[in-house]
Curated annotation (Swiss-Prot):
Keyword Nucleotide-binding annotated: yes
Ranges of Basic residues composition bias in the record: 604-622
Protein name in the entry: Probable serine/threonine-protein kinase WNK7
Reactions accelerated catalytically: L-seryl-[protein] + ATP = O-phospho-L-seryl-[protein] + ADP + H(+); L-threonyl-[protein] + ATP = O-phospho-L-threonyl-[protein] + ADP + H(+)
Stored SMART domains: S_TKc
Keywords of the record: ATP-binding, Kinase, Nucleotide-binding, Serine/threonine-protein kinase, Transferase
Organism: Oryza sativa subsp. japonica
EC number(s) given by UniProt: 2.7.11.1
């Protein structure tokens, strides 16, 4: 900032054009060494970058200019601007953007500083301009960035906003350098910073806790590596910062990470994105074999779509043409696009899986729970093939996708076989499911909520990822099946479940025939007139039928708890409604004995009217 102190009095007038101006300057610095041209190289929130020229060295430079009124608009903006200049003035490294001079122009009311010029702009724009880049080149960029981070961290500096937009490229040299240190924090005797600031897509989870260290730059570097390899902005599948925040704090990586087919690249990026306690330093990452110049990094196609990509992918592609030719001489039929994603409910130890089938307008989203303790991937995959009429995928292939998602959500999960022979005590051997199961109030239950108390709205059912567009028929108990009796003499109201055993059994049979673990039957199936349909096999008798019925049961603990809670609430409500609730409320507090007799008749009439209102309200709730 010595340059700023040099500016004052008449010396500032030299900031106008000096000499004969054959270079076409718009203005010059106070010393006349640097001249600004009219060409704009970039524009940020606080500053504009112009092309400039250093007459002393005969090289082009970047002229950064900010209007003082804009800088002084907020104290934070002023602090960030001066912090960037002061840091750049103190840092000297071949991976950090070089700083030359700074000053204030009083009459123009601008703050100016000169940095080295990068001919190819930012790394992000450079990468978009040239989509095909070898892994060898990406590894060279990564080594330069890590060396710059190691230099900053050794001096107690956290960048806090490292991203490809803040990394600059000299394309003719293949050289990258770290810039834009406006958000950098200097740890002066403190091991952690305590402010939440940066770009959400590149912010480490611990930054939201407002207590972090230099490891946040390593996390951001991992996201930069992901963008360099995939040419895709991290968390581009999210629509707003709130969704990004939820994913980051939940430890969910961007979808682009799972589209990496290079196992070594995925391993290297994964090291950068682990939790802060296990995250390596920049110096440690420099020793990773992935960055070794001796490695043969000649792969141009880093990104490839696998047949069964790990979730949470929104789409998946079929096998490549080369794999199909090796598998069989005849061209293989196109497989159904399928992706399986999951969401872990840690509170209830339950996993909800989402199956996305097809693409475009024909996409189908199906949600169902997976009980880690009782379900197996192979059983669920077999049921999916039968229920969803998947003819071009093997159950083993789908089971591998399911198991891969379960392992991602529950790292310690190990696949096992479950015997349904031990479950005879839970299911009726006659084949009749528990009637209370169909009264489940859990909104996430795939079968209980379909056949339980509900509305006939065709808008769909809420799933773990939002609304499921199931505009198809499903079973429910209408409100008329719950009756309310009113006794005028006793002024009591009672609620009773007036569903007969025979009608309940018929409804259960209809529900069992039209829905399963994977959701309700399709509309086309309901029009077949009772016959079998493409998505469901014919009914089988004996042990196999009982086994299939047991498989379709939702074994999720959340459903069991919601069922018990629902039954407890119904029983408690039935008990309380047998008492004179309205009258009891009226009798609370002091009551004049002399007025009791005169108001008994009117009070009794009022209680009858109130009781009718309360009963109607309970009827509406159920």
């Amino acid at each position: 900032m010595s340059g700023a102190r040099r500016c004052g009095g008449r010396t500032s007038e030299r900031s106008s054009v000096v000499g004969d101006n054959r270079n076409g300057y718009v203005e010059t610095d106070p010393t006349g060494r640097y001249g600004r041209l009219s060409e704009v190289l970039g524009k940020g929130a606080m500053k504009t970058v112009y092309r400039g020229f250093d007459e002393l060295r005969g090289v082009e430079v970047a002229w950064n200019q900010a209007t003082i009124s804009d800088v002084l608009r907020t104290p934070d903006a002023l602090h960030r601007m001066y912090a960037e200049v002061s840091l750049l003035a103190d840092l000297r490294h071949d991976a950090i953007i070089a700083f030359h001079a700074s000053w204030v122009h009083p009459s123009r009311r601008t703050f100016n500083f000169i940095t080295e010029l990068f001919s190819s702009g930012t790394l992000r724009s450079y990468r978009l301009r040239y989509p095909r880049v070898s892994r060898r080149a990406v590894a060279a960029w990564a080594r330069a960035i890590l060396r710059g981070l190691a230099y900053l961290h050794a001096r107690g500096v956290i960048h806090r906003d490292l991203k490809c937009d803040n990394i600059f490229v000299n394309g003719h040299l293949g050289q990258v350098k770290i810039g834009d240190l406006g958000l950098a924090a200097v740890l002066r005797g403190c091991a952690s910073a305590r402010s939440v600031i940066g770009t959400p897509e590149f912010m480490a989870p611990e930054m939201y806790d407002e207590c972090y260290g230099v490891g946040v730059d390593v996390y951001s570097f991992g996201m930069c590596m992901l963008e360099m390899l995939t040419n895709e902005y991290p968390y581009s599948e999210c629509d707003n910062p709130a969704q990004i925040y939820k994913k980051v704090t939940a430890g969910k990586l961007p979808d682009a990470f799972y589209r990496l087919t290079d196992a070594d690249a995925r391993r290297f990026i994964g090291r950068c994105l682990v939790d802060a306690a296990h995250r390596p330093s920049a110096e440690e990452l420099l020793l990773d074999p992935f960055l070794s110049p001796s490695q043969n990094h000649d792969d141009h196609n880093i990104i490839a779509h696998a047949t069964a990509p790990p979730p949470p992918l929104p789409l998946a592609c079929s096998n490549s043409s080369e794999e199909q030719e090796e598998a069989a001489p005849a061209p293989a039929a196109k497989t159904t696009d399928m992706a399986i994603t999951g969401k872990l409910n840690k509170e209830h130890d339950t996993i909800f899986l989402k199956v996305q089938i097809g693409g475009g307008r024909n996409v189908r989203n199906i949600y169902f729970p997976f009980d880690v303790a009782n379900d197996t991937a192979m059983e669920v995959a077999t049921e999916m093939v039968k229920e969803l009429d998947i003819a071009d995928r093997e159950p083993t292939e789908i089971a591998a996708m399911i198991e891969q998602e379960i392992v991602r959500l529950v790292p310690g999960y190990k696949q096992h076989e479950y015997s349904y022979a031990d479950d005879n005590d839970d299911d009726d051997v006659s084949g009749h499911p528990n009637p209370f199961y169909y009264l489940s109030s859990s909104p996430t239950s795939s079968q209980g909520s379909l056949c339980g108390v509900g509305s006939t709205s065709s808008e769909g059912f809420p799933g773990p990822h939002g609304k499921v567009d199931w505009s198809r028929d499903y079973c429910y108990y209408p409100p008329s099946s719950v009756s309310v009796s009113d006794d005028d003499d006793s002024s009591t109201s009672s609620l009773s479940a007036a569903v007969s055993a025979s009608s309940l059994h018929q409804q259960q049979q209809h529900c069992s025939a039209s829905s399963s673990r994977l959701g309700p039957a399709s509309a086309s199936a309901s029009e077949d007139g009772g016959g079998g349909h493409a998505g469901r096999p014919r009914q089988r008798e004996g042990e196999e039928e009982r086994r299939r019925r047991r498989m379709s049961r939702n074994r999720s603990m959340v459903d069991m708890r919601s069922q018990l809670l629902h039954r407890t609430l119904v029983e408690e409500l039935n008990k309380r409604l047998f008492f004179n609730t309205v009258g009891a409320v009226h009798d609370i507090g002091f009551r004049d004995p002399t007025a009791a007799a005169s108001s008994s008749s009117s009070s009794s009439h009022h209680r009858r009217r109130s009781s009718n209102k309360i009963d109607h309200k309970h009827h509406y709730m159920f």
